[in-house]
Amino acid sequence: MIEPILLGIVLGMVLVTLAGLFVAAYRQYQRGNKMGL
């Protein structure tokens, strides 16, 4: 049985990681568009 607190921490870390990757990809995409790619 998984500890609810541990499960919450893991889910939170996963969400933050996915959000960070999405933001980084979005910013890189915007920078590429501004350069005329």
Curated annotation (Swiss-Prot):
GO terms for biological process: cytochrome complex assembly; photosynthesis. Pfam families: PetG. It is a single-pass membrane protein. The chain crosses the membrane at residues 5-25. One of its GO terms (molecular function) is electron transporter, transferring electrons within cytochrome b6/f complex of photosystem II activity. It is found in: Cellular thylakoid membrane. The keyword Nucleotidyltransferase does not apply. The 4 large subunits of the cytochrome b6-f complex are cytochrome b6, subunit IV (17 kDa polypeptide, PetD), cytochrome f and the Rieske protein, while the 4 small subunits are PetG, PetL, PetM and PetN. The complex functions as a dimer. NCBIfam families: PRK00665.1. Belongs to the PetG family. This is Cytochrome b6-f complex subunit 5. It comes from Synechococcus sp. (strain JA-3-3Ab). The gene is petG.
